Amino acid sequence: MSDAPIQDETPPAVGTDESDDKLVAAARAAAKLARQVTIPLGQVGLSLPQYRVLAFLDEGDAAPSDLAGRLSVSRPSITALMDGLVTRGLVERRPDPDDGRRVSHHLTEDGRSTLHSADRAVGDRLVAIGTHVHAGDSTRLIASLARFGEAIRAARAAGTT
C-alpha cells in the first residue's frame, strides 16, 4: 500500500442532488461491503459480530456492558455471543481486578490467531474486489477505508457514536 497521502476532493455542497446521490451511493456501498466482509469471515468460522468482538478485545480487555455498548446490542445478546466465544476458547472470562463482582473478557492466543486469520481473509477479499477498479484506485480505496475506520474511532472517543 502506498504511503502517499490521499487527496481529498472538495465535496459537493450539502443538500444538493449531487451530494444526496453520493451519500445514497456511499450508504449502499457500505451495506454491500458489510456483506462482502461476511463471506471470508464465514470461511474462518466467524460471524461479523464475533469478528467485531475479537477486534475490540484485541485493543484490551472489556466488560460485557462495554462490549454491548460498542456493538449496540442488549446485554443478553452480548452474553450469548460471549458464551459462544468462550466455549470455542477464543475468549476467556477473568474476574475484574477492581470489582470482584464483575468479569472482564480477554482475547486468548487462539482468539488472537483466529482474528489474524480473519483479518487476512477480509483483507484478501478487499484486494480482490479492488482489482475491479482502475489501476491505482484499489490502493486508494483501501487507504480511504482505513481512514474511515480512524474517523469512527475518533468519533467514538469523542462520544458521538
Give residue spans per PLM region.
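Hydrophobic alpha-helical membrane segments, chiefly transmembrane helices and signal peptide h-regions
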Residues: 31, 78-81
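N-terminal leader segment of winged-helix/HTH proteins
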Residues: 1-45, 107, 136, 152, ...
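Charged, amphipathic alpha-helical coiled-coil/dimerization segments
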Residues: 83-146
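DNA-binding alpha-helical recognition surfaces that contact promoter or target DNA
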Residues: 55, 80, 143
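N-terminal helix-turn-helix DNA-binding core of bacterial DNA-binding proteins
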Residues: 35-77
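Generic structural concept
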Residues: 27, 58-61, 108, 142-149
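Short amphipathic alpha-helical segments with heptad-repeat character
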Residues: 20-27, 31, 72, 112, ...
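Exposed, interaction-prone assembly regions rather than primary DNA-binding/catalytic cores
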Residues: 137-161
